A protein has these predicted regions:
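N-terminal, immediately post-signal peptide pro-regions of secreted/luminal proteins
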Residues: 1-31
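Generic hydrophobic, helix-prone segments enriched in Leu/Val/Ile
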Residues: 15-20, 48, 181, 202
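Active-site beta->alpha N-cap acidic-glycine motif
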Residues: 20-133, 141-166, 171-172
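Core nucleotidyl-transferase/polymerase catalytic module
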Residues: 136
Length: 202
């Protein structure tokens, strides 16, 4: 299931067209290759690309710290899975809420678990469709990853997700354009409190 979706489906073509029609000039960079920063020295050195993963590049508009000392967020990535029921039972026992950053293709495998997470009062957010490092994808593939993830979550629980976390924290400047267009937020950081959730490490 963890396969990057094709970009030639009618749905993805529509999402691509919507992004193109947004009036925003979205830069296009060559995808990186497997191996991270050492395997991609030119991309890592490109300040225009602003590859956060390789150098911590941020923009002046990015929120990168929690607004108050000792703020933190409890989060879980990569589900739902067969481990989710035990985790939900534990969270209920200790009266904790969390944010589940879910992988779209796994929602198809375990739709009832996503519904249970949501009905128990937990936040649901996007962790892409197939869990790839996003800089290894083309712009069109990123649109497909985000679009299908948004759709499967909305189809399963009736709610549009407002947050997302990129797998492996792999992001660059261009990524915010897609998140704004597909999710309607100014960035994948949906406010200062959310950034505490996004960067929390369970």
């Amino acid at each position: 299931m963890d396969v990057v979706p094709p970009t030639d489906s009618p749905e993805v073509q529509q999402w691509i067209q919507e992004v193109m029609n947004s009036g925003v000039n979205i830069p296009s960079f060559n995808p990186t290759v497997a191996g991270g920063c050492p395997a991609n020295p030119a991309a890592a050195a490109n300040s225009t690309r602003c590859w956060w993963t390789c150098g911590g590049c941020t923009r002046s508009t990015d929120i990168t710290t929690c607004p108050q000392k000792y703020n933190w967020g409890l989060t879980y990535d990569d589900g739902p899975s067969h481990y989710t029921p035990d985790l939900l039972n534990y969270l209920t026992q200790v009266n904790l809420s969390t944010t589940f950053f879910v992988v779209g293709s796994r929602v198809i495998q375990f739709p009832q678990l996503l519904q249970e997470e949501y009905m128990l009062g937990h936040q649901i957010a996007v962790h892409t469709w197939s869990h790839p490092p996003l800089t290894t994808l083309t712009n069109e593939q990123i649109i497909a990853e985000l679009g299908w993830s948004k759709k499967v979550i909305q189809d399963t629980i009736g709610v549009v997700p407002l947050m997302m976390r990129p797998p492996y924290g792999d992001i660059e400047f261009v990524f915010s354009f897609f998140v704004h267009r597909i999710y309607g937020t100014d960035d994948y950081f949906n406010g200062a409190v959310t950034v505490c959730v996004l960067f929390a490490r369970p």
